[in-house]
């Protein structure tokens, strides 16, 4: 039986991971669990799966949770709690599903403790890929991608030689506004932006999908996970989200991984690797019913944040950390109604232009760059 820890347990990836664990009680056991403050979502899962260690945002949430739990786990708070969950002695694998740069320290701690990582927190590699991959190599730790695109590439590369790879092709749905012009984007609402055509995801990642920032993060993540240059990564629009990504080899062969848009598939693959297990209640792919698959160019002109991600990735150093933090802050401001949809892009670009890159940043310098970018965007005054 595989022992599992989850960081970010009440978000979209976290709850779907819990679905997989609950559906396979003979294969998986939840030993530790971290979430912020969403007790309403966490409580039934905790009472059902009964992990011994729980971490929450602060003392207030701890008191509220302990008052309603029907068992008595150890409950910790704050970043120390996150790290305790990530390094729990019993855990074989840690699913890092927390959103944002807050996942960086717990992920590094889990690697240091020798835990396999099911990586759903792409910001960890975006902000500190050089530190994370170096530490993983030193500790002999497997980094298993949980997001659908990198899980697809991981499977396509299984058994292949790095020198035979010509390029990685990431597919993108195009997000909520894929059929709208940039002129039409000027006045879109938060509600419209959160209406993703294919995937059920959390609010931030749904906005990131609409701006293509999410795909930009995946470009940087692919660079670190698969040891490819940015010239060896391409992005193509694929509105059906059936082909999750592709790898082109030197002989012209292209290998693709297909499946229904169901996040339980890459989550379960990370948990069971190198084995496979039937997804209970999952919908099987029926190509005859789908009929056709469509592809189009992912234009930098249409999606400026994708361009900025390539630029920040190539620049390296502290630039990707600024890219991520500026975007997080800008998306938060958009969700609060403080800025328009297009001003997300303007905020991120302004932060990158204002930042003085640190070429080989330490962890502290990465976190300081993160803080600087958030403060910069929070104080930015933009004309609507």
UniProtKB/Swiss-Prot annotation:
Keywords: Isoprene biosynthesis, Manganese, Metal-binding, NADP, Oxidoreductase. 1-deoxy-D-xylulose 5-phosphate binds at residues 122, 148-149, 173, 196, 209, 214-215, 218. GO terms for biological process: isopentenyl diphosphate biosynthetic process, methylerythritol 4-phosphate pathway involved in terpenoid biosynthetic process. One of its GO terms (molecular function) is manganese ion binding. Its EC number is 1.1.1.267. InterPro entries: DXP_reductoisomerase (IPR003821), DXP_reductoisomerase_C (IPR013644), DXP_reductoisomerase_N (IPR013512), DXPR_C (IPR026877), DXPR_C_sf (IPR036169), NAD(P)-bd_dom_sf (IPR036291). It is an enzyme of class 1 (oxidoreductase). It catalyses: 2-C-methyl-D-erythritol 4-phosphate + NADP(+) = 1-deoxy-D-xylulose 5-phosphate + NADPH + H(+). Transmembrane segments: none annotated. NADPH binds at residues 10-13, 36-38, 121, 123, 202. Mn(2+) binds at residues 147, 149, 218. Belongs to the DXR family. This is 1-deoxy-D-xylulose 5-phosphate reductoisomerase. It comes from Exiguobacterium sibiricum (strain DSM 17290 / CCUG 55495 / CIP 109462 / JCM 13490 / 255-15). The gene is dxr.
């Amino acid at each position: 039986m595989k022992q599992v820890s989850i960081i970010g347990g009440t978000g979209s990836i976290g709850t779907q991971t819990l679905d997989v664990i609950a559906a396979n009680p003979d294969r998986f056991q939840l030993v530790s669990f971290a979430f912020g403050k969403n007790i309403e979502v966490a409580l039934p899962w905790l009472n059902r799966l009964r992990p011994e260690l729980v971490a929450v945002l602060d003392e207030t949430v701890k008191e509220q949770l302990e008052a309603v739990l029907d068992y008595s786990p150890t409950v910790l708070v704050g970043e120390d709690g996150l790290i305790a969950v990530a390094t729990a002695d019993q855990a074989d694998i840690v699913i890092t599903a927390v959103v944002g740069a807050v996942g960086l320290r717990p992920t590094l701690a889990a690697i240091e403790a020798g835990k396999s990582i099911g990586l759903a927190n792409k910001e960890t590699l975006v902000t500190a890929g050089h530190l994370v991959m170096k530490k993983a190599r030193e500790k002999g730790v497997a980094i298993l991608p949980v997001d659908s695109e990198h899980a697809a590439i991981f499977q396509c590369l299984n058994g292949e030689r790095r020198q035979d790879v010509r390029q990685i092709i990431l597919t993108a749905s195009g997000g909520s506004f894929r059929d709208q012009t940039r002129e039409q984007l000027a006045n879109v609402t938060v509600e419209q932006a959160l209406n993703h055509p294919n995937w059920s995801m959390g609010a931030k990642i749904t906005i990131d999908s609409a701006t293509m920032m999410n795909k930009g993060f995946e470009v940087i993540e692919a660079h670190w996970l698969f040891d490819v240059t940015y010239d060896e990564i391409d992005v193509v629009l694929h509105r059906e989200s059936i082909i999750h990504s592709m790898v082109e080899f030197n002989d012209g062969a292209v290998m693709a991984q297909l499946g229904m848009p169901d996040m339980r598939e890459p989550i379960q693959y990370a948990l069971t690797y190198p084995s496979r297990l039937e997804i209970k209640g999952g919908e099987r792919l029926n190509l005859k019913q789908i009929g056709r698959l469509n592809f189009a160019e992912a234009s930098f002109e249409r999606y400026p944040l994708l361009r900025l991600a390539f630029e920040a990735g190539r620049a390296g150093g502290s630039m990707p950390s600024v890219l991520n933090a500026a975007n997080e802050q800008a998306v938060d401001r958009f969700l609060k109604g403080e800025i328009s949809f297009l001003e997300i892009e303007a905020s991120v670009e302004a932060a990158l232009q204002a930042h003085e890159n640190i070429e080989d940043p330490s962890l502290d310098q990465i976190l300081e760059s993160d803080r600087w970018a958030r403060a910069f965007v929070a104080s930015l005054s933009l004309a609507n």
